[in-house]
Regions:
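Extracellular/periplasmic ectodomains of large secreted or surface enzymes and adhesion receptors
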Residues: 5, 305, 386-441
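C-terminal cap of metal-dependent C-N hydrolases
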Residues: 13, 363-407
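Divalent metal-coordination and catalytic microenvironments
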Residues: 13, 32, 54, 65, ...
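His/Asp/Glu-enriched, well-ordered alpha-helical/loop segment
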Residues: 72-75, 79-84, 231, 270-273, ...
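Active-site gating loops and adjacent loop-to-helix segments of metal-dependent hydrolytic enzymes
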Residues: 74-90, 131, 148, 153-160, ...
Length: 441
């Protein structure tokens, strides 16, 4: 996609491939891909050679649930907002991108919010800091859509100012029963829309005169879900609503790709695993609202051991900066191995987003989304030193620290210049002098 950088060879490092064990040796990044991994790798001409003695290399971290780059994430005026898309309102200058890079995040699933039973379209992005939003899109990644169950869509329907209590007014639904009904009714309509287009296409193929159905931007993404062309990421907490959504999907013949948060997933892990649905959860958040009261820090480990592809996500710009340490908690709470813990933020979210052929592990031919640490990534004392995406270096800890004095000096100079300009124009906005009193006198 972008001009190729010079090859990068990291030597004498501990390489955590995640899927193929641990290698003591070298890794070569070339032409945006992982070119070689082995005990000894020769440096090609023009390569940047890095001594990785005492250091660790691992795949870039993937966050399956993020809202960075977006400000207004909920189109909460309707219960089904599948016609809107988060990809059209992303801010590539959000400083949270750079901070996520500093914590090793290279890819994120940017989601619509959880105010709607069926929310807006989602998109997978690479943290290519300094690029425009289009250039940050993960090329070829499947599109998604956000669903939400429980308190959030209920609250949006019957909050203060919108009726005040369930059943007294405001936007439907106001109960968990209503949330299920909204989803079922939407897919009833989607199946009708799908059938109308199928009938039109069949007549057209036979050479018959046919009038195409009116295009419906709300229904199109749901038809894509029915046809397996769009992934469903569903916000949920309680075991009853988790089972409800799985049963709805069974009835209408579509797949729930990931259950997001899924704090009571440990109670119904077998049912989740049977359907091949993934779980993207917090490490140890609990009791921050009523439906989170039964959350336990063993959730990720239990789900993993029951055969559910499980990831740890952030849902928060600050938490996103230390997802590696969040994953490490599953070693204490549940006894996961170091490789299983790393998988929670690498290969597992890659599988959930269906991008594991490109990222999520260190394998020859995969994208060169690579992290260099000064120690074991699962240690609280280890720090990210460098981050590469597609073989291009997007973060260097030493350069960041060394450059801070100049940044502060530049910032101070700009503030001084702006203040002087404001004084010269009288301090008013737009260059006009400030006035007092009634301007009509």
């Amino acid at each position: 996609v972008f001009a190729a950088d010079a090859p990068v060879l990291i030597q004498n490092a501990t390489i955590l491939t995640v899927t193929k064990g641990e290698v003591k040796g070298s890794i070569l990044l070339q032409n945006g891909k992982i070119a070689q991994i082995g005990e000894k790798v020769l440096a090609p001409q023009g390569a940047t050679v890095i001594d990785g003695s005492g250091k660790y290399v691992m795949p870039g971290i993937i966050d399956c649930h993020s809202h960075i780059m977006a400000e207004a994430i909920n189109e909460g005026s309707v219960s089904v907002s599948s016609m809107v898309g988060i990809e059209d309102v992303l801010n590539p200058e959000d400083i949270a991108i750079y901070r996520a890079l500093a914590g090793g995040v290279t890819t994120a699933n940017i989601l619509h919010g959880s105010a709607n039973s069926i929310g807006g379209k989602t998109i997978v992005m690479k943290m290519r800091w300094g690029r425009n939003a289009d250039d940050m899109k993960f090329e070829g990644a499947m599109p998604g859509i956000k669903f939400a169950l429980g308190e959030n869509p209920k609250r949006a329907g019957a909050s203060a100012g919108r009726g005040g209590a369930p059943g007294t007014g405001g936007r439907y639904p106001a109960t968990r029963m209503g949330v299920e009904d909204v989803i079922r009714e939407a897919f009833n309509n989607a199946k009708i829309y799908q059938a109308n287009w199928a009938d039109y296409n069949a007549k057209k193929a036979k050479g018959e005169i046919a009038i195409p159905p009116a295009r419906d931007l709300q229904m199109e993404p749901l038809v894509e879900v029915l046809e397996g062309k769009r992934l469903v990421h569903a916000h949920c907490y309680r075991q009853d609503e988790i089972l409800m959504l799985l049963h709805v999907a069974d009835d209408y013949g579509f797949h729930i790709q990931t259950l997001q948060h899924v704090l009571e997933g440990y109670k119904v892990a077998q049912e989740i695993a049977q359907r091949g649905t993934g779980a993207s959860t917090f490490s140890d958040w609990f009791a921050y609202k009523m439906e989170a009261n039964d959350a336990i820090p063993y959730n990720a480990a239990i789900l993993t051991k029951k055969g559910v592809v499980t990831s740890i996500n952030s849902d928060d710009a600050e938490l996103m900066r230390h997802l590696d340490k969040e994953a490490a908690k599953a070693m204490h709470y549940g006894g996961l191995t170091p490789t299983e813990a790393l998988s929670l933020v690498t290969i597992n979210p890659a599988k959930q987003l269906k991008i594991d052929n490109r990222v999520g592990s260190l394998e020859v031919g995969k994208d060169a989304d690579v992290l260099l640490y000064d120690g074991d990534p699962l240690s609280n004392f280890s720090k990210v030193l460098k981050v590469w995406i597609d073989g291009h270096e997007y973060f260097d800890r030493d350069q960041e620290i060394d450059g801070r004095p100049k940044k502060e000096a530049d910032k101070k100079a700009l503030i001084t210049k702006a203040a002087a300009a404001q004084r010269a124009t009288g301090g008013g906005r737009g260059g006009a002098a400030a006035t007092t009193g009634d301007p009509n006198k």
